[in-house]
Every structure is written in C-alpha cells, then in structure tokens.
Swiss-Prot record:
The record marks 84-85 as: Cleavage (non-hydrolytic). The modification Pyruvic acid (Ser) is found at residue 85. This is S-adenosylmethionine decarboxylase proenzyme. GO terms for biological process: pantothenate biosynthetic process; spermidine biosynthetic process; spermine biosynthetic process. Keywords: Autocatalytic cleavage, Decarboxylase, Lyase, Polyamine biosynthesis, Pyruvate, S-adenosyl-L-methionine, Schiff base, Spermidine biosynthesis, Zymogen. It catalyses: S-adenosyl-L-methionine + H(+) = S-adenosyl 3-(methylsulfanyl)propylamine + CO2. Its cofactor is pyruvate. The lineage of its organism: Eukaryota, Fungi, Dikarya, Ascomycota, Taphrinomycotina. Pathway: Amine and polyamine biosynthesis; S-adenosylmethioninamine biosynthesis; S-adenosylmethioninamine from S-adenosyl-L-methionine: step 1/1. Binds 1 pyruvoyl group covalently per subunit. Its EC number is 4.1.1.50. The active site is at 21, 24, 85 (schiff-base intermediate with substrate), 99 (proton donor), 275 (proton acceptor), 288 (proton acceptor). It comes from Schizosaccharomyces pombe (strain 972 / ATCC 24843).
Length: 378
C-alpha cells in the first residue's frame, strides 16, 4: 500500500503562527514487541494503536493543547503533523513530540486509556525527554520544572528514573525512563540495527533562518509556475508553501532516502516557522524550525538507518547542521545493543569541521546505549 496524505483544511488554516519555545517535549511509549501489519492476503493484521480512531487521537491531543494539520499513512506508520510538532503511531508504540507551551504530559492519562481500549494494559518501556527550555517560566503545569515533570510521571510509573545529561549551565538534556517487569518480552525482539538520532540546534545563521519565513503564493508561482500550485490544489496554503520551502531550504534533500521513495509532509506557518514529517517503510524523520533571531531553534529526529539514507550518521549530522546553519547543537543517539554489532561511538560521532565538541557522554541502558554530545561553532 502506498502512503497516503490527508490534510485537515480547517486546522491547517487556523494555525498560522509559530511558538517561541522551540525545544520539544518528547514522549515515547512501547506497548509490545513490533507488530507485523503488512501481512499477506488471508492473514489478519493486528493493528494495535493504528486501529485507534481519529476522534480519540484528537481528544487526546486536545489535552496537550495541539491539533492535527495533516496525516501521512502507510501500513507501518501513521504520521501526524501537528500545530505544535508531530505524532507517530505504530501498531505497538507511539511517539508524541510537542513544542511551545503545550502540556504534553497532561495527555498521558487519556493516552493510556486509549491504549487499554486496544488491548495494551501498560507500556513495557517509557521514554520522556527534552532539551533545556529557552523560556522555562512560560511553561504550564505539569511542565513548570523538570522536578514537577518527574513527580507527575512517577504517578504513573513509580519505578522510573530521572537523568540530567550535560552541564546544567549550558545546553543539557533531560530524560525520564522506565521499564516494566516483563520488559524482556520486548528486549528479545529488538532490531540490532535500531538507531534513533536527534539533533537539537540553536543560534541559526540569519541566512538559513530566513528560509523559514513564509513566502507568498505569488513568490511560489513566480519561481515554479502556476502548474506547481495547481497540482497541489487539494492542499492548504501552508502545505503548498511547506513543499516549496522544503525544496528550497534543503529539507527535502536531507530527508530523502537513497531510493528516493520517502514521503514528505511539510507545512510552512505564516509568517514564520516550519514543520515536516517523513515516512519510509517502518522509519520516520521529523523536522521543526523556529527561525526568530532571538530564539532560533531547529530539530531533526530520525530512525532511518545509515543504509537507507545512503550515508553515515556523521554525514547525516553534518548535513543537518549545514542545512540549518546551527552555531550550537547537541545530539542524542539511542542505539540498540546487538551481540554482533561493534560499537565505535567516537567513530560514529567524529569531530565535525568548524565545530568544537564540548561534551561526550555515554549511558548504558537495558537494550540500548545512549550517546549525548554537544558542539559549538569555532
């Protein structure tokens, strides 16, 4: 089945401003081992979370104070582009990422209720993470401090552990993680090639930031012709501009797989700000940009493999920071443990030209290793 795009015209037209707090809150819940949904004829697929109705997801997202702009669907993933960032729904897990002053954790009770309705009693693995906020004083409960977030999470996951990674007076990263007692059911099925990279960038160059200020449709017509706009008449204005900006800024190239079969869903906010989701088989990438000079921020997250991209992790990182002109960035890399897989952390995250590495930290978690590193332009 080919991926399909569904645009929510009403919400796409309603949300035309960007949040000033770029750094996202990120929640990832695993409810089971990966479920095969692309079964042959005659076999019945277990759709798990993918069986949840749009109304239920809308209800949950309302608790987080965000709405759906559009959805790209495939057999493996439903990728929701939101008014504030993104949501990815697999049969067995969900990833919810929201920026600004959204109240992501306030949606957790409803999320667990929805998961229970499709047969998942509790998550086997929980991740909640975020970079340090630019404007922490603007956040709403339960996000007014990391301590408050941890207290709230422990109401649901009392055995969870809290980590602060990196120097607290510079760029740093928060993580809350928990495992169910029967986590081994999941660990035995982990893909040894599973890697999730997140690059969190600040202090973008003015030249690159300007690429994410909304052009007019007249500018797009002048640059690409009337046919370019006419072909996209089923899209909202934000999606038409998003497609154009993705081409012009290098975002589409950054998200392209080696076989050119990835599907990109992009939205340009007016007057400023950009978001996109990409899906490829059972993999995804997501980008969010807040380009204002005084609080510029861009993020890139993906679990697309090096083989699928046709480039190394280091090459992907270099391409990412060049695309957004970041003067500072930190990154996290979650990598599944594999008996036959050699780990060469320093080789994967080599020194990057024009950047000085300030921090390099490795954590050993059950089933995964985590790398955190931060860099500043020189």
């Amino acid at each position: 089945m080919s991926p399909t795009l569904v645009v929510d015209q009403e919400n796409s037209e309603e949300f035309n401003t960007s949040s000033f707090e770029g750094p996202e809150k990120l929640l990832e819940l695993w409810f089971s081992a990966p479920i095969k949904t692309n079964l042959s004829a005659g076999e019945k697929a277990n759709l798990g979370l993918k069986a949840v109705s749009r109304n239920d997801w809308d209800d949950m997202l309302a608790q987080a104070q965000c709405k759906v702009l559009s959805v790209v669907n495939s057999e493996e993933i439903d990728a929701y582009l939101l008014s504030e960032s993104s949501m990815f729904v697999f049969a067995h897990k969900i990833i919810l990422k929201t920026c600004g002053t959204t109240t992501l954790l306030a949606s957790l009770p409803r999320l667990l209720e929805i998961a229970s309705s499709v047969g998942f009693d509790r998550p086997l693995r929980i991740f909640y993470s975020r970079k340090n906020f630019l404007y922490p004083e603007r956040q709403l409960a339960p996000h007014t401090s990391w301590e408050e977030e941890v207290r709230y999470l422990q109401l649901f996951f009392p055995s969870g552990c809290s980590y602060v990674v990196g120097p607290t007076n510079k760029n740093h990263w928060h993580l809350f993680s928990d495992l169910a007692d029967d986590y081994s059911l999941l660990e035995d099925s982990l893909d040894p090639e599973d890697e999730t990279l997140e690059v969190l960038m600040t202090d973008m160059s003015p030249e690159r930031s300007l690429q994410f200020y909304a052009p007019s449709l007249d500018v797009v017509r002048s640059a690409r012709g009337d046919d370019y706009v006419r072909e996209k008449n089923n899209l909202s204005g934000g999606h038409i501009l998003g497609s154009y900006v993705a081409d012009e800024s290098g975002v589409r190239d950054l998200c392209s797989t080696s076989d050119k079969k990835a599907v990109l869903d992009a939205f340009q906010f007016e007057p400023i700000g950009f978001s996109s989701n990409m899906i490829y088989k059972d993999r995804y990438a997501t980008i969010h940009v807040t380009p204002q000079e005084h609080c510029s921020y861009a993020s890139f997250e993906t679990n697309v493999s090096q083989f699928q991209f046709g480039r190394s992790i280091s090459e992907t990182i270099e391409k990412t920071v060049k695309t957004f002109g970041a003067n500072k960035f930190c990154l996290t890399l979650f990598q599944a443990k594999g008996a036959s897989q050699e780990k060469h952390f320093s080789a994967k995250l080599k020194s990057f030209s024009s950047y000085k590495r300030e921090e390099f930290i490795v954590y050993d978690f059950p089933g995964y290793d985590l790398i955190f590193a931060s860099f500043t332009a020189v």
